[in-house]
Amino acid sequence: ESAGTRQLSGIGGQMDFLEGAYRSVGGKGYICINSARKAKDGTLKSNIVPFIPGGSTVSAPRTMIQSVATEYGIANLSGKTLRERAESMIAIAHPDSGMSWSSMRKRRSTNKLNVPY
C-alpha cells in the first residue's frame, strides 16, 4: 500500500476479509507474502522485517492477523506474545535473509535497525 511515506495504492478489501475470517466460526485469515524480493541492485531483501519505516501505512492492526504464509511455511500468530510472534515470523523468513532472533536483538541494541526499501 505504501513504500515509506509514498502512497502506492488503496486499502482494497483486506480488512473485510480479515474481519470476516476473524468473526466466522472456524474461519482462518491468512496474509500470504513472498519471503524476499530482489532489490534494483540485485541484492536479496527480506519482506519480513523487524520494523517498518516511519510514515508507512498500516492497513490491518496486528491483533487481526491470525497467520502469515510464505514459501517457507506458515506463522500462526493468534494468542502469541510479541516475542513469540517475532520468532514465528523469523521462522518463515528466507533462509538467506540473515533473520534470526539474535541478529534482531543485536541490531536493536546497537540502534542499527535500518530497513532498506
Write out the residue ranges for each language-model feature.
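Conserved phosphate- and dinucleotide-binding cores of soluble alpha/beta proteins
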Residues: 1-117
